[in-house]
């Protein structure tokens, strides 16, 4: 049996595919979250693009996704249920969930938790210097660690390379 989340994801992917040649071209799905049930159902859809998603693109997809959810092929995905739909971009503090999101964050500060060879979790805050590809696939990132605090001035760190499959969580950090 197909879960409600999978049905919603299928509708989102259909909306994205049908956006070719429109202002929605180049937008991709980051995540779908369904919270609550019945009249309390909240659907949160995060979309992004390689250049960042605009508000008008979010509203465009919100309308299209709602139409599909309410009447997909004559059969509503959410059969007569009330639901709140939120379509937005991943905000600051949202973890990077897809490899292609790293490309857009090149040059930005990230807080990364990864596992070393002994499977111990390590944490580093660093500037994403480069996204590394193997055979066209994003496989690793190069970070330049930064020290925070008063004693960090003039302290240059060596870049580190982290394989994507070792990264547990990577979150863009605010720079003040």
Swiss-Prot record:
GO terms for biological process: ribosomal small subunit biogenesis. Coiled coil: none annotated. Keywords: Cytoplasm, Ribosome biogenesis. Its main location: cytoplasm. It comes from the Bacteria. InterPro entries: Ribosome_maturation_RimP, RimP_N, RimP_N_sf. GO terms for cellular component: cytoplasm. It is found in: Cytoplasm. Belongs to the RimP family. HAMAP family: RimP. Required for maturation of 30S ribosomal subunits. This is Ribosome maturation factor RimP. It comes from Chlorobium limicola (strain DSM 245 / NBRC 103803 / 6330).
